[in-house]
UniProtKB/Swiss-Prot annotation:
Annotated active site: H131, D153, S205
Low complexity bias spans: 38-56
Motif window: Nuclear export signal: 136-146
Residue segments, region Disordered: 15-95
Residues exposed to the Extracellular side: 322-686, 752-756, 801-1216
Chain positions covered by the region annotation Binding to the viral RNA: 78-106
Sugar-bearing residue positions: N268, N941, N1009, N1070
Origin species: Barmah forest virus
Location of region: E1 fusion peptide loop: 884-901
Ranges that cross the membrane: 687-707, 757-777, 780-800, 1217-1237
UniProt keyword annotations, A-Z: Capsid protein, Cleavage on pair of basic residues, Disulfide bond, Fusion of virus membrane with host endosomal membrane, Fusion of virus membrane with host membrane, Glycoprotein, Host cell membrane, Host cytoplasm, Host endoplasmic reticulum, Host Golgi apparatus, Host membrane, Host nucleus, Host-virus interaction, Hydrolase, Ion channel, Ion transport, Lipoprotein, Membrane, Palmitate, Protease, RNA-binding, Serine protease, T=4 icosahedral capsid protein, Transmembrane, Transmembrane helix, Transport, Viral attachment to host cell, Viral attachment to host entry receptor, Viral ion channel, Viral penetration into host cytoplasm, Virion, Virus entry into host cell
Disulfide pattern: C105-C120, C264-C273, C278-C282, C281-C313, C339-C443, C342-C348, C411-C425, C471-C585, C519-C545, C521-C539, C715-C736, C849-C914, C862-C894, C863-C896, C868-C878, C1059-C1071, C1101-C1176, C1106-C1180, C1128-C1170
Protein name, entry field: Structural polyprotein
Biased composition (Basic residues): 57-95
Length: 1239
């Protein structure tokens, strides 16, 4: 069985157990449902005995002599003490309640006489994890036949009838918060169940997780250790399906898996790592044997449990929790390392040498590793006020108060443990660590410490108004972490003066030390290890001996400046305290700038106190992101369109602004006001119309004059050619000429000279005729009806209750429709997208972070050679250099001159901060759109979560809605993305296994804990110079650090369509793009018969006030009469207006006040109330607010809506030129007819 049908396995409704029809008499009673343990039976017997003895004791005291009362006294005193002692160790209230609930619904699964896991009764099923092998400890449940589901790692069977009352209910409702299980509280957040690390363990598989009502919300399968918390692997329920949540690196929590992998071995003897039974497994009794045991288990998963247990003898006293993590330092010692700058002496071997300095924290705190040990006294005891370091004569001690750390000024020491120091320092170019007891105890190392700024403000300190943002800081806790450092036994130290002679006999006296020797007497050579005095030779001359002091009872740090004793040395590891963890940091919040809203633009006046980042992006298709650091007072103006803009000032929250279509003048006034109004809204359209109108007037006037000239020429030409011909009166009137034979220009000249009044009267006659004709044409034009329809919100009326349509994929923009079905009243329908999520399908390629170069202590072979051996490490390099460290030079202490060899090793691994500070490279595939939609059917409102894929239905009672697929397949994510902290970058990267040195991906691994580490850092070993022991090498700087400095703008700030990018999981929220197809199947129960709804008669509709392009800025009053009181559906059948309310109460008579939104300056729309319709008409004024912080609830008009007043003025303006043109055409036609008739 590869799957479990949801409806049959999990989806059953809870029903009470059926009533039994008969009870067979001869059958024995049902077996007990629970097998009580021996301890529980003893407690029960003891409690019953106490209850039985109490009344008898009272009777004895009253009837008999007091001499018989003493025997029951010890019983009476002993019985109450037992429960009182148990009350001290009882679990908390949350755990007690959970134990009561699960007491009857879970049963242990036994394997080889031990509890391997649990089976749980949920609903009508018995559920047991498939990986939990064994038999259920109940005779009824042990006989059941289980069906296995490998997908969910579960086995299930039907609950026996006699045990149905013991089963628990289950629920799919899981709001974020805390839940209960056997070991306390379980936190549910971001779709994950987590518990504090240590509260769950192998053997808990199958335990249920309850809510506060006692219902099961999940069943535990295992867990994944994530440091301070453990993520649980569970099977849980969603609304319509079963799901399994499996964190990365989760481990099955059956006890059998623990027994197989978690045992340690010593001389073929297996034992639990936290309880070694052997005597040598105690550091205080056998240090060398204990270190060898730990070295053998160096790669064991339970190494640290073994380390903790071997630091104490079985009869020893366990340390307090505050010092438990210091116990590992009992097996270590400080050392003398190489220091680059010891003060006036220059470089030198120093007891306080600095090994490494980290500055990965966002708050500027430094983490320093030194060669001394803090918190451990010289006597190898834990003392937080002491420091021990390696001096010339052995281990020395100093007070912790003498420790100081400084850069350009003294630092604040925040925490110390062992080799590590946490300090908050000022910026500087070097770090100094010193002990004030001796000026020589000082070490400096070059380190560039620059101020770290987090957020968008470079404030020196978070003063004034503050907020907290996510960041990375070093934890001050000393608990176990995944970071560790390697230790090994100290190198062999040359020692002399151990050979003594008595006559010809020579002996070697180690003097309470363990030594290695190699002595030569003639041709005889003796070598070995000695701890007691031994006789070497009987020689005539003194033998030549080379002796080394060996110490295999203690570890020291695996430093590159200290040689190791052997090639395969006894090694161990201890954890590194103060890990880099997720936290929140306080940052300053810059005062908001002064903002001035204008028409289509916003002006900012900045007065920053320190450099502050100002970023802008458009919420349309082209984000056009820009950002700049502002550190001086200045003003800046940005353009704001209808699609909106988003700006971020410093660490303030993002602000989104949208421009409204507003103007300072009205569209219903004089021509100047109208032109100003449309110029504010549509400048290009207005200029185009005015230019076209002017061109029309000029062309029409010029063409009219040309036609008149042509007509006059045609009618006068015949008479001018005939001498003495007299012009008829009709022709003279038609051609505006005199009947005299004199030339026209001469007549005009004569009238201008002698009678100007007659000149003007004759010239005004044709002009008057033209004006009269133009007015007539204008009056005809005014009789034409002018109407322009614009597109508004999608408002439709459907004729069936099975319908398909589309809605905009924009948050807050409603889709409204009226469903009309014959015989039923109209049913209003509204759909609004509340939230949308575009979740891509990701395939993780690898993670990358800062690398750590591991340089083991070099192996130096005096008077001989060494060979390299391959190791399975990333970018591993090994070289052997001969002829190094001349005779007794530096720290090698070799007795040969040119035959000494050094084997240098170096490799790369993930840095200490990799777990908390890393980037993930993903390949992006198809994305799925999930929307949260509020659906209103009549008076029913419900919000549903549905996948917009055209397949997954959303149900509201009996109605079904199928959304999608979306009209345009689009995603803001490229085919490759990089996720770093809470930011997503659309960037390409090198494939896995092909990283380049100094680039992103120079070190790669599948997860932060996997062993498949790949690295390419151009690592090369160099020949060591004479002097101190060291391992020189060259390497390309970290590509991850370079990428963090040079990375581009994250998609969070540069996403188109106003997308909000988030991670965990990677998704884009509330993107404004495309349309969503909707397929609806409305159930009959939602409809109301027409005879049951009011019958309304509408009288009049008056638009009382109207502001266009505003959020429901119009108010219409509709007077009505109705046959009865009831509810009516309200709907607008015109695209020019959107009604706010879908349903309103009606009385027998009255008036309805309806709010509507429109983008038209003069809307004309049809409103339906119940079964009646009426047309509303009104004139709207522009909104006063030019910029608003919300998007318009209606669609903008594709073409400018023109008011009636504007049409009238346009008609007045164009009627005159058109009339002149018409008259000119008529004159030409008449003249042409007359001339043709004469011929």
């Amino acid at each position: 069985m590869d799957f479990i049908p949801t409806q049959t396995f999990y989806g059953r409704r809870w029903r009470p157990a059926p009533v039994q029809r008969y009870i067979p008499q001869p059958q024995p009673p049902a077996p007990p449902r629970r097998r009580r343990g021996p301890s529980q039976l003893q407690q029960l017997v003891a409690a019953l005995g106490a209850l039985a003895l109490q009344p008898k004791q009272k009777q004895k005291r009253a009837q008999k002599k007091p001499k018989k009362t003493p025997p029951p006294k010890p019983k009476k005193t002993q019985k109450p003490k037992k429960p009182t002692q148990k009350k001290k160790s009882k679990p908390g209230k949350r755990m007690r309640n959970c134990m009561k609930i699960e007491n009857d619904c879970i049963f242990p699964v036994m394997l080889d006489g031990k509890v391997n896991g649990y089976a749980c009764l949920v609903g009508d099923k018995v559920m047991k994890p498939a990986h939990v092998k064994g038999t259920i400890d109940n005779p009824e449940l042990a006989k059941l036949t289980f069906k296995k589901s490998s997908k969910y790692d579960l086995e299930c069977a039907q609950v026996p009838v006699c045990m149905k009352s013991d089963a628990s209910k289950f629920t799919h409702e899981k709001p974020e918060g805390h839940y209960n299980w056997h070991h306390g509280a379980v936190q549910f957040s971001n779709g994950r169940f987590t518990i504090p690390t240590g509260s769950g363990k192998p053997g808990d598989s199958g335990r249920p997780i309850f809510d506060n009502t006692g219902k099961v919300v999940a069943i535990v399968l295992g867990g994944a250790n994530e440091g301070a918390r453990t993520a649980l692997s569970v099977v849980t329920w969603n609304k319509d399906m079963v799901t399994r949540i499996t964190p990365e690196e989760s481990v099955e929590w059956s006890a059998a898996a623990l027994n197989i992998t978690a045992l340690c071995v010593l001389q073929n003897l297996s034992f639990p790592c936290d309880a070694p039974p052997c005597a040598p497994c105690c550091y205080e009794k056998d240090p060398a044997g204990t270190l060898r045991l730990l070295s053998d288990h160096y790669y064991h998963p339970k190494y640290y449990e073994l380390l903790d247990s071997t630091m104490h003898c079985p009869q020893g006293r366990r340390p307090k929790r505050s010092v438990a993590h210091f116990e590992a330092y009992k097996a270590t010692r400080p050392y003398i390392g190489w220091c680059a700058d010891c003060g006036l002496a220059g470089s030198c071997p120093s007891p306080v040498s600095i090994e490494h300095v980290w500055s990965d924290a966002d708050d500027g705190v430094l983490k320093i590793q030194v060669s001394m040990q803090i918190g451990i006294a010289k006597s190898n005891t834990i003392n937080h006020a002491k420091i021990r370091y390696m001096g010339a004569n052995g281990v020395q001690e100093a007070e912790r108060s003498t420790l100081s750390v400084s850069t350009t000024a003294p630092c604040d020491i925040l925490a110390t443990m062992g080799h590590f120091i946490l300090a908050r320092c000022r910026p500087g170019s070097q770090v100094e660590v010193s002990l004030s007891t001796d000026p020589k105890l000082l070490c400096r190392t070059p380190f560039s410490h620059k101020p770290r700024f987090i957020g968008n403000e470079k404030s020196p300190a978070p003063t004034g108004h503050k907020t907290r943002i996510p960041c990375k800081t070093y934890s001050h806790q000393t608990d176990l972490t995944r970071e560790e450092i390697t230790m090994h036994v100290p190198p062999d130290v040359p020692i002399q003066g151990l050979v003594s002679n008595t006559g010809k006999s020579y002996s070697l006296d180690p003097k309470t030390k363990t030594i290695k020797y190699k002595c030569t007497c003639g041709e005889t050579v003796k070598e070995g290890t000695a701890t007691n005095k031994i006789t070497l030779f009987n020689c005539d001359t003194a033998p030549k001996c080379i002796t080394y002091a060996v110490d295999n009872t203690v570890w020291q740090y695996n430093s590159q400046y200290v040689p190791r004793s052997e090639v395969t040395e006894v090694k161990g590891k201890i954890h590194v305290p103060f890990p880099l963890t997720d936290s929140t940091c306080a940052v300053s919040v810059a005062p908001e700038p002064q903002v001035t809203y204008r028409l289509g633009e916003v002006e900012f006046h900045f007065h920053p106190m320190y450099p502050t980042l100002f970023s802008i992006r458009s919420l349309g298709k082209d984000p056009s992101h820009s950002q700049e650091w502002i550190d001086t007072p200045m003003s800046k103006t940005i353009q704001v369109g209808a699609e909106g803009v988003e700006y971020v000032w410093g660490n303030n929250n993002p602000v989104r602004l949208w421009a409204q279509k507003s103007s300072s003048s009205s569209a219903h006034g004089n021509p100047i006001s109208i032109v100003s109004h449309y110029y504010d809204l549509y400048p290009y359209w207005t200029i185009t119309v005015l230019a076209s109108l002017g061109l029309l007037i000029v062309i029409s006037s010029g063409f009219s004059c040309f036609l008149c000239s042509v007509a006059r020429t045609k009618c006068l030409t015949p008479y001018q050619l005939a001498p003495g011909a007299q012009l008829p009166t009709f022709i003279a009137l038609l051609c505006c000429a005199k009947s005299a034979r004199a030339d026209t220009l001469d007549d005009f000249s004569y009238l201008w000279t002698n009678n100007q009044a007659m000149f003007w009267l004759q010239l005004a006659s044709p002009v008057a005729a033209f004006l009269c004709l133009s007015y007539c044409c204008r009056n005809l034009a005014c009789c034409m009806k002018i109407f322009l329809g614009i597109s508004g919100l999608c408002v439709i009326a459907t004729q069936a209750y099975e319908h398909s349509t589309t809605m905009p994929n924009q948050v807050g923009i409603p889709f409204k429709a009226l469903i009309e079905r014959p015989g039923y009243a109209g049913l209003p329908l509204s759909l609004v997208v509340i939230k949308s999520e575009l979740v891509p399908s990701l395939v993780q390629d690898y993670i990358t972070c800062n690398y750590k170069t591991v340089v083991p202590s070099p192996y130096i072979k005096c008077c001989g050679g060494a060979e390299c051996s391959h190791k399975n490490e990333a970018d591993y390099k090994c070289s052997v250099f001969t002829g190094v460290y001349p005779f007794m030079w530096g720290g090698a202490y070799c007795f040969c001159d040119t035959e000494n060899s050094q084997m240098s090793e170096v490799y790369v691994t993930r840095g200490e901060s990799c777990e908390a500070d890393h980037a993930i490279a993903y390949q992006v595939h198809t994305a799925s759109l999930k929307a949260q939609v509020m659906i209103s059917i009549g008076e029913l409102n419900q919000t549903v979560d549905v996948f917009v894929n055209g397949d997954s239905p959303a149900r509201i009672q009996q109605s079904k809605f199928i959304l999608g697929p979306i009209s345009s397949a689009w995603s803001p994510f490229d085919h490759k993305v990089i996720v770093y902290r809470d930011e997503v970058y659309n960037e390409d990267y090198a494939p896995y296994g092909s990283g380049q040195a100094g680039r992103f991906g120079d070190i790669q691994s599948r997860t932060v804990n996997s062993t498949d580490v790949y690295a390419n850092t151009n690592l090369k070993l160099k020949r060591p110079a004479s002097g101190n022991v060291h391992v020189p090498y060259t390497q390309t700087p970290s590509g991850f650090s370079y990428w963090k400095k040079e990375k581009g703008v994250p998609l969070n700030r540069n996403a188109p369509f106003g997308c909000i990018i988030k991670v965990n999981p990677v998704r884009a929220e509330n993107c404004v793009y495309g349309n969503i197809p909707i397929s609806m199947d409305i159930a009959d129960a939602h409809f109301t018969r027409i005879d049951e709804s009011p019958s309304v008669s509408l009288k009049a509709c008056e638009v009382q006030s109207c502001t266009y392009s505003s959020d429901f800025g119009g108010v219409a009053s509709i007077s009505y009469t109705s046959n009865k009181v009831g509810k009516c559906a309200i709907h607008s059948h015109s695209n020019s207006a959107t009604m706010k309310d879908s349903v309103q109460d009606v009385q027998e008579s009255g008036a309805l006040s309806l709010f509507f939104a429109t983008s038209s300056v003069e809307p004309n729309f049809v409103v339906q109330v119940c079964n009646a319709r009426i047309t509303c008409h009104g004139k709207c004024e522009p909104p006063k607010d030019h910029i608003v912080p919300y998007a318009a609830k209606h669609n903008d008009a594709e073409f400018p809506s023109i008011s009636t007043t504007a049409w009238q003025w346009l008609a007045h303006t164009t009627s005159g030129p058109l009339t002149i043109l018409v008259v000119a055409i008529i004159v030409v036609v008449v003249v042409s007819i007359v001339v043709c008739a004469r011929h």
